[in-house]
């Protein structure tokens, strides 16, 4: 996954839009989501290379959410590296993040045509849930009465739905 990500071309312009994307995706991380997708796929089929672009789509999407989360939290560091809005600026972080979302969809759409509708439906519903979780997280920062059930639901939406999506997509 790391090698595949590193070799993806970013030939479009402006360079200042795509440089932060390459930067974010080169920071590393555990790559749990693409790994889960590949493992889910490998339970049923023996050629995981076939869905490598889709696995990278999930990683691109995940990193898009981190880029925007860093901006919302005004974080200085991510994985020991300067965040995009600190290294460049907030506008670049927003635009590069938005472009990562589009790239994630473009990469996901490269799946087998017979599974495309199902995959995109799952991906879209998951993306909406993650946004809902992020909004709850932001709202909870201004509340002193957050119930445990609300907090757990926020964590489920922000974190577990994408992990579940990875396994489900692999199985599709």
Label every PLM stretch briefly.
Residues 10-172:
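Mg2+-dependent prenyl diphosphate-binding active-site environment of isoprenoid biosynthetic enzymes
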Residues 1-9:
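N-terminal amphipathic/basic leader segments beginning at the initiator methionine
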């Amino acid at each position: 996954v790391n090698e595949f990500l590193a070799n993806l071309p970013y030939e479009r312009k402006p360079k200042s839009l795509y440089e932060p994307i390459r930067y974010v995706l080169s920071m590393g991380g555990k790559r749990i989501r693409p790994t889960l997708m590949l493992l889910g796929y490998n339970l049923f089929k023996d050629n995981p290379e076939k869905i490598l672009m889709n696995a990278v789509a999930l990683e691109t999407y995940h990193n898009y959410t981190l880029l925007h989360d860093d901006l919302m939290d005004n974080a200085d560091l991510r994985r020991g590296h300067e965040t995009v809005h600190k290294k460049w600026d907030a506008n670049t972080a927003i635009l590069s993040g938005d472009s990562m979302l589009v790239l994630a969809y473009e990469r996901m759409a490269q799946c087998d045509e017979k599974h495309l509708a199902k995959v995109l439906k799952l991906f879209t519903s998951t993306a909406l849930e993650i946004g809902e979780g992020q909004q709850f997280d932001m709202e909870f920062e201004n509340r002193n009465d957050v119930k445990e059930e609300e907090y757990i639901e926020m964590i489920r939406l922000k974190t577990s739905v994408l992990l579940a999506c990875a396994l489900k997509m692999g199985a599709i």
